[in-house]
């Protein structure tokens, strides 16, 4: 192998220039850094990086090529009370690596030591980084750039969406290749969604506890290498290009790709977790630590990345630019996004949030925050700056309570229906900022929401202690999927009422993949470790009628001007009128204490009839000739200026023009 040259400090990671590879690694406290390269026989060669520019250690290896397997050993003080945990016996991954060879297994040699160094060498068992080339023919690929006011998001897991689809070739099911297959593209376009939000596709690791009980981290939130495309979701050997092929196919169909990304914690977990990367490279720069060097745990995952540190912030920004520029993704959903604004308290003016919104290379990206973590002051719904949108748990909970429990007022329902203006408008945000959702990957599916009163998570191996107990669900009289015809009909009506509310609310709707098909997880509301038929969509048993209903709702949404406007609904602007059952404006007492019966007139022509009460009701319609709008059942049309609505039902009428 050629002799190492000085190289350069940027960019971080391993960069192939056609003639060799430049390596650059950040570590402020290290005293010695070794580049470790491995041949086909796992033989290790160590090369000291003698060049240092500021806190960047670097070197250039002439003649090195893509495919080279490598890692680092970093030496320095081991003083846990000072936050220093250097251990040269541990082979470390490059935080900027683009590809991983192998898997992180549960092995004692990966432990770095709690109070003193663990001197067992980890190189033999440790996964290795791989040098990559990033050339790719994007042809004429363009970002769809769907305006927020026209966006409908579909949250899905790559494998869960495609693994059991009978019309996708068996050898690619569950992969990026399946995601980009014409069968899947046709399904998504026929449904009418505009953006596919993928659960993490960053390279993740399975937690030791899960490995010990024979489970896997299915969701992928235990991220190991945020720059690397997860190999476990690839059908072939080239995960990066397979993923890019899928993005290109989705773009060609006008569908945006939004990635769920994890920058709040790492796969190194708590102090008893493995030393794989940041802990051994520069522990006190990468992590939030207490006065005695202990890890803060505002994420519930054992550690918290210190995203206000300049070097760590730069690392995150470089990662976002990689996914935007190299992989052409259209946006990001940030898991536990309060961590992004911690300094350590949350502020909307945090350096990382400011960098994201002002970065020219990220212009046009959709940015979505999950606005909470479990630390002090962690709940920050409505507090993120423009241009962020935010997952609204208030929408989820209030709409569930309205339809399934009847314990919130018409006023609360209307506030959520109107893009939660009470939360977002006061901060000069626009309606799109409210990501309206009924369900998501964490929690009950929609079918389970109307079939189970209690979680059933025993398969997760935690004695049913995991997962929330606050579901606001309603099994309609019988626990579980099996029920008599009357209960099935009431469950179906509840699903349709909830879905209608979701799709026709102002704001940005997000649909969980499978909800339109009647998918159940058998009452498991925390299926993060169930990479099996519990979570995979069963296409052969799909509720086709419900799917057609949802597609019709999305098409209906596109025709209603009030749901396409970018500004807030204002009294007198013609966008919305709120009427009682008699067709008159609601009185203050009716808003807060009235029956759960409401007429919502949108753009003067579409009438959403809401009967969430427990008994049928007759609605006196506004003046005009009204007909049932598709996709609603035309067997119950209005007659004589009245509409007779069943209990806990919803319908949309359209005024006929001359």
Swiss-Prot record:
Pfam families: Alpha-amylase (PF00128), CBM_48 (PF02922), GlgX_C (PF18390). SUPFAM superfamilies: (Trans)glycosidases (SSF51445), E set domains (SSF81296), Glycosyl hydrolase domain (SSF51011). Residues 457-481 are annotated as: Disordered. Residues 457-468 have a biased composition (Basic and acidic residues). One of its GO terms (molecular function) is glycogen debranching enzyme activity. Pathway: Glycan degradation; glycogen degradation. CDD domains: AmyAc_Glg_debranch, E_set_GDE_Isoamylase_N. Keywords: Carbohydrate metabolism, Glycogen metabolism, Glycosidase, Hydrolase. The active site is at residues 335, 370. Its EC number is 3.2.1.196. One of its GO terms (biological process) is glycogen catabolic process. Transmembrane segments: none annotated. It catalyses: Hydrolysis of (1->6)-alpha-D-glucosidic linkages to branches with degrees of polymerization of three or four glucose residues in limit dextrin. The record marks 442 as: Transition state stabilizer. PANTHER family: GLYCOGEN DEBRANCHING ENZYME. Removes maltotriose and maltotetraose chains that are attached by 1,6-alpha-linkage to the limit dextrin main chain, generating a debranched limit dextrin. Belongs to the glycosyl hydrolase 13 family. NCBIfam families: glgX_debranch, PRK03705.1. This is Glycogen debranching enzyme. It comes from Pectobacterium atrosepticum (strain SCRI 1043 / ATCC BAA-672) (Erwinia carotovora subsp. atroseptica). The gene is glgX.
């Amino acid at each position: 192998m050629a002799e190492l040259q000085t190289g350069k400090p940027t960019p971080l990671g391993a960069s192939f220039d056609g003639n060799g590879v430049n390596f650059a690694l950040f570590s402020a406290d290290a005293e010695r850094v070794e580049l470790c390269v491995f041949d086909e026989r796992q033989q290790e060669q160590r090369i000291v990086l003698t060049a240092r520019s500021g806190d960047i250690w670097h070197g250039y290896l002439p003649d090195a090529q893509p495919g080279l397997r490598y890692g680092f050993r970093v030496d320095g003080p081991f003083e846990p009370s000072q936050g220093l945990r250097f251990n040269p016996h541990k082979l470390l991954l490059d935080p900027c690596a683009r590809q991983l060879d192998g898997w992180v297994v549960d092995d004692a040699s990966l432990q770095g030591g709690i109070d003193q160094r663990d001197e067992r060498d980890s190189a033999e068992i440790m996964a290795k980084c791989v040098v990559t080339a990033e050339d790719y023919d994007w042809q004429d690929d363009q970002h769809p750039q769907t305006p927020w006011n026209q966006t409908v998001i579909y949250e899905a897991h790559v494998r869960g969406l495609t693994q059991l689809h009978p019309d996708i070739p068996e050898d690619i099911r569950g992969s990026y290749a399946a995601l980009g297959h014409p069968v899947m593209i046709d399904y998504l376009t026929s449904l009418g969604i505009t953006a596919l939000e993928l659960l993490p596709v960053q390279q993740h690791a399975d937690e030791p506890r899960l490995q010990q009980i024979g489970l896997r981290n299915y969701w992928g939130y235990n991220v190991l290498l945020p720059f690397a495309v997860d190999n476990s979701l690839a059908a072939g050997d080239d995960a990066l290009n397979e993923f890019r092929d899928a993005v290109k196919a989705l773009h060609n169909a006008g569908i945006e790709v939004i990635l769920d990304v994890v920058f709040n914690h790492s796969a190194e977990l708590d102090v008893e977790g493995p030393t794989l990367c940041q802990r051994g490279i520069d522990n006190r720069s990468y992590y939030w630590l207490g006065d005695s060097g202990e890890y803060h745990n505002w994420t519930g995952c054992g550690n918290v990345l210190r995203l206000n540190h300049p070097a760590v912030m730069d690392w995150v920004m470089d990662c976002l630019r990689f996914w935007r520029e190299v992989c052409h993704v259209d946006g990001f959903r940030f898991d536990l996004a309060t961590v992004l604004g911690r300094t350590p308290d949350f502020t909307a003016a945090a350096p990382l949030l400011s960098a994201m919104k002002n970065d020219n290379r990220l212009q046009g990206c959709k940015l979505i925050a999950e606005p909470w973590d479990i630390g002090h002051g962690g709940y920050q719904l409505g507090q993120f700056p423009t241009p962020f949108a935010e997952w609204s748990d208030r929408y989820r909970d209030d709409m569930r309570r309205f339809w399934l429990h009847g314990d919130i007022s018409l006023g609360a329902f209307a506030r959520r229906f109107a893009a939660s203006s009470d939360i977002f408008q006061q901060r000069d945000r626009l309606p799109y900022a409210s990501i309206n959702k009924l369900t998501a990957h964490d929690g009950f599916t929609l079918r389970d929401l109307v079939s189970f009163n209690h979680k059933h998570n025993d398969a997760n191996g935690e004695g049913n202690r995991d997962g929330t107990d606050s579901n606001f669900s309603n099994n309609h009289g019988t626990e579980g999927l099996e029920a008599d015809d009357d209960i099935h009909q009431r469950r179906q009506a509840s699903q349709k009422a909830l879905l209608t509310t979701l799709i026709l609310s102002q704001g940005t709707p997000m649909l969980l993949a499978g909800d339109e098909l009647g998918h159940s997880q058998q009452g498991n509301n925390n299926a993060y470790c169930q990479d099996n038929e519990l979570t995979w969509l069963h296409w052969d048993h799909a509720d086709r009628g419900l799917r057609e209903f949802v597609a019709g709702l999305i098409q209906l949404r596109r025709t209603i001007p009030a749901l396409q406007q970018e500004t807030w609904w204002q009294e007198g602007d013609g966008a919305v009128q709120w009427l009682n059952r008699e067709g008159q404006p609601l009185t203050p007492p009716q808003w807060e204490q009235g029956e759960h019966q409401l007429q919502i007139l949108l753009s003067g022509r579409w009438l959403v009839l809401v009967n969430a009460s427990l008994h049928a009701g007759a609605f006196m319609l506004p003046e005009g000739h009204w007909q049932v709008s598709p996709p609603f059942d035309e067997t119950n049309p209005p007659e004589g200026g009245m509409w007779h609505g069943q209990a806990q039902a919803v319908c949309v009428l359209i005024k006929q023009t001359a």
